[in-house]
Amino acid sequence: MPRSCYSRSGTLLLALLLQISMEVRGWCLESSQCQDLTTERHLLECLRACKPDLSAETPVFPGGADEQTPTESPRKYVTGHFRWGRFGRGNSSGASQKREEEAAAADPGFHGDGVEPGLREDKRSYSMEHFRWGKPVGKKRRPVKVYANGAEEESAEAFPLEFKRELTGERPAAAPGPDGLGFGLVAEAEAEAAAAEKKDAAEKKDDGSYRMEHFRWGTPRKGKRYGGFMTSEKSQTPLVTLFKNAIVKNAHKKGQ
């Protein structure tokens, strides 16, 4: 009883598949596997023989021939003259580029041109080494401080700030020169001479008013230039006095 039910269901399934296969390919029934359908083994062999033929074909849609979906070859023929229908590195589609980018992101060592990442980095650094931004950014070098005294350089880190100030205030000891005198004595003599000059200048300032001879207003007055012989005494008379004298002379002449 179970075998008869199985055979009936298998027969119905085979009939359905055969009907579809007849529409797709009529020679499926003419094969040797589908000649004898009485046994279960022959039925399964016929199903296996017709199944690859059905899967290889495109699905059949109802309607006329003009309503069927176009095949791949006419589609390629229609879009072949467009830029996105061509194959190539420069004219590849956006989907292929996206797939390449995803593959590159998944595999860090993969590049589309097949070049190893180490070689690419070397080439990039070589081609951009003449640019300022192509050089690696390193730590800025600080200028080296040069001290006049060797003790200050040695004690720059060992002594605190107060000791540094004391060291900067002190001067190195006088070293004996080739003539037997120390540089310290020469410095003391120069300091004494400068102090004497300052003292003399202060005394001169106390004696009289300080004249700024190097300025224009430090020169003697106009009346004192050239010993005073260029100016006449009449010019010193006021103008009002001259007018009075002239009026008196005119009145005296008229009275005569």
Curated annotation (Swiss-Prot):
The modification Phenylalanine amide is found at F87. This is Pro-opiomelanocortin. Coiled coil: none annotated. It comes from Cavia porcellus. The modification Valine amide is found at V137. Keywords: Acetylation, Amidation, Cleavage on pair of basic residues, Disulfide bond, Endorphin, Glycoprotein, Hormone, Phosphoprotein, Secreted, Signal. InterPro entries: Mcrtin_ACTH_cent, Melanocortin_N, Opioid_neuropept, PMOC, POMC-derived_peptides. Glycans are attached at T71, N91. Residues 88-120 are annotated as: Disordered. ACTH stimulates the adrenal glands to release cortisol. Specific enzymatic cleavages at paired basic residues yield the different active peptides. GO terms for biological process: neuropeptide signaling pathway; regulation of corticosterone secretion. Pfam families: ACTH_domain, NPP, Op_neuropeptide. Belongs to the POMC family. It is found in: Secreted. The gene is POMC. It comes from the Eukaryota. Disulfide bonds join C28-C50. Residues 100-122 form a propeptide. Residues 1-26 form the signal peptide.
